[in-house]
Amino acid sequence: MDIVDEINAIHRVVGRAETPAGEARTVLLRRTYDAPVEDVWDAVTNPERLPRWFLPVSGDFRVGGRYQTEGNAGGEIVRCEPPRLLRVTWIYGEPVEGGYSEVEVRLSPETDGTTVFELEHIAVTDPERWTEYGPGAVGVGWDLTLLGLGLHLAGRTIEDPRTWEQSPEAREFATLSSNAWGAAAVAGGESPDDVARMVANTTRFYAPEPPAGPAA
């Protein structure tokens, strides 16, 4: 795959929103997939397909039902309007009083048979965590999610994700993704100096330097 093309395929927006729990940060990803909306919807919502490109998921798959992804977030299905809109709460671990975190996926079919995919994550964030990492804290992970979905829709896959995560290709992807979220943060009104620190911290987290080899 061409890592630069994969990064550039995503449009990123960083903003703010009012929620019942107070002011939240928002990250929005937009990408066009060369697949009909019905196929994209099925890939995103079918528990048999999700493990092929994302994570195994269990739960009660109806509005008001609860779900859990393996080793990751869980929550409640808030809205489901096939094949256009899915909104869920997105909680890591136990819910925090006064917390707020929702993910909304929106699909728009195009006349040429492609589908515009939008994912918006709205969350009341810990101010210290935002200051340290900025939008890349969740944005890099969502970029990887959209990469996996694109490969799946194209009939491709990363055979051994754990090995790939340690590869130079994965480090390049995470580094470029972190920089792209930094640019989106500046466009969203963050200070360039603050963003430089956020990007450096996010890059170190997602793409740490490989351990040095034995001394000669």
Where do the language-model regions lie?
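Short, surface-exposed beta-strand-loop junctions and turns on beta-sheet-rich folds
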Residues: 48, 85, 94-95, 123-125
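Short strand-connecting beta-turns/loops that link adjacent beta-strands
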Residues: 82-83, 110-113
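Short beta-edge strand/loop motif at the mouth of beta-sheet-based domains
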Residues: 20-22, 28-29, 35, 47-79, ...
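Ligand-binding pocket scaffold of soluble enzyme catalytic domains
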Residues: 88, 99, 103-106, 110, ...
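Hydrophobic alpha-helical segments that drive targeting, anchoring, or assembly
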Residues: 31-33, 68, 73-76, 90-92, ...
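Hydrophobic/aromatic beta-strand elements that line small-molecule binding cavities or substrate pockets
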Residues: 31, 75-78, 102-109
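Terminal "cap-and-tail" regions of soluble proteins that handle hydrophobic small molecules
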Residues: 1-21, 122-216
